[in-house]
Amino acid sequence: MAWMRLPFETERSLMLLRASARRAKQMACAASLAVVVLCSHYALAADAPANDSYNIISADDPVARSNSEILASDPSEQVALRGKTAALGRVYPPPQLNRISVSSNGTGALKLSERPSFDSRLGDQYAHLTNNNNYVFYTVDPDLQDFVSGIVDAAQASHVAVVAMNPQNGKILAIAGKSRTVKDVEYHAGFPAASLFKVVTAAAAVEQAGIRPESIISFRGGTYTLNEWNYRPDPARDRRFMSVAEALGRSCNPVFGHLGSRYLNGSILLRYAQLFGFNRSLDLEAPLPPSQATIPNDDLFELSRTAAGFGEVRISPIHAAAITAGVANGGLMPRPQLIDRIVSPDGSVIHQSSPETLQRIVQPQTAKLLLEMMEYTTTVGTSRREFMRGTTPTLGNFPVAGKTGTLRGTDPKGLNNWFIGAAPINNPQLAVAVITVDPRYSSKASHLGRLVFQKYFNITPVEYVPVRSSSTRSSSKSKKLYSYRAPTSSSKKASTKKYYAKKKKK
């Protein structure tokens, strides 16, 4: 059959028919897609926390968080609720939260029935559920808490505890510990305070004896030797000299022994120990035994030992962090806080914590001097290897005021290794206390403390730059300006004999 061209009108009709068929096919596909999307929407809406029938908060009770993120199905409700008092974040069924009992005394202070374990979250905070279904939110920073828990678990020591606190309001930002024999080691008040007590002695010496950081104290014997032979000041035999600031940084026992027996007395030292929180409760929400300090008054030798950190002084890691926070907070010791707020099931805030001060431990100027003296610990003293790389600070523009302590204890048994610190010195934002017992080098308290500072301030440690020999010689000479041994008469005679022997040879 020969091909023949259709008339124009017929051809146009066929083209329109084909176009209509294509449009009908597209509309059918679009309708199918719309059905799928609509079904998915309703399926997701049914599973949403706001519409979950198992959720204790229904879709009719949208709840806001502190950052105004609202859990509601209606956008108009989100606009209406924006800016209201924060209560809850994302809501989960109650079985996902551990429970804890909270009571209140006559003054309104809250008390937890036990020391909380941070193992359950609600939104972006750690939380527990009370017996009457109220939510208890804690002050800990989840990121810092997870990091601290990690380094505590990895630490090679028989007992470890780390406490990080905001010195300005007393909020505990991280707290973790591990021990095979001591329950809740972070709150255990049986650790010897060791040289941490030198901070108390230094505070008393500054305010009661007029001692300054640059004051020079003479002594004899080794830097860490304090016994019945050298505890009494003797100008005729004391041939070594050291400033009080460097003595605190290097933890020089004879210098602080002299401060206790020569410039202070037992009653003054006991009063300052009580100001720093010893022999009294810190009024924490969780059960916390008080730290104990026994200060001798009649025995000068025992008074010297106590002033240097060898006495009967016991302290808990959380109390050590509170002392550090008190010095960093201008002399006002904040009350440590674990509870941030308590929220009812309907989203209303029942309790909101606010900063509280236990008492003033030292004057603001004294606190400033103590921070300056404690900086010697991290620059030239016992923590120098952790916080300095050659002549460069490890933490860069975040200078750290610190203090170490090392002493063998009995509860628990072992060599106790302490570090407390606050940074930055000009405006402290974090106070840290670390205790390790029988640690390996990589798990010493100063090392763990440095890691906590690096994590909190998001600092990358500086690379080590070797110091040239000329700089090393000059730095060693500068150190002798702070601590040197005076020549004895025997050394003078020996040098005189060498001089005349050389003269005879000539």
Locate the predicted segments by residue.
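A short, polar/charged loop-to-alpha-helix boundary motif
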Residues: 181-195
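Extracytoplasmic/periplasmic proteins that interact with beta-lactams or build/remodel peptidoglycan
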Residues: 41-161, 169, 352, 356, ...
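Short, gly/Ser/Thr-rich active-site loops of penicillin-recognizing serine hydrolases
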Residues: 349-350, 354, 446-493, 497, ...
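Beta-lactam-recognizing serine transpeptidase/beta-lactamase-like catalytic domain environment
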Residues: 114-124, 140, 161-185, 208-434
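Active/ligand-binding-proximal structured segments within catalytic/core domains
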Residues: 194-203
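Bacterial N-terminal signal peptides
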Residues: 30-40
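Short, solvent-exposed mixed-charge patches
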Residues: 504-506
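Bacterial N-terminal signal peptides that target proteins for export
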Residues: 19-29
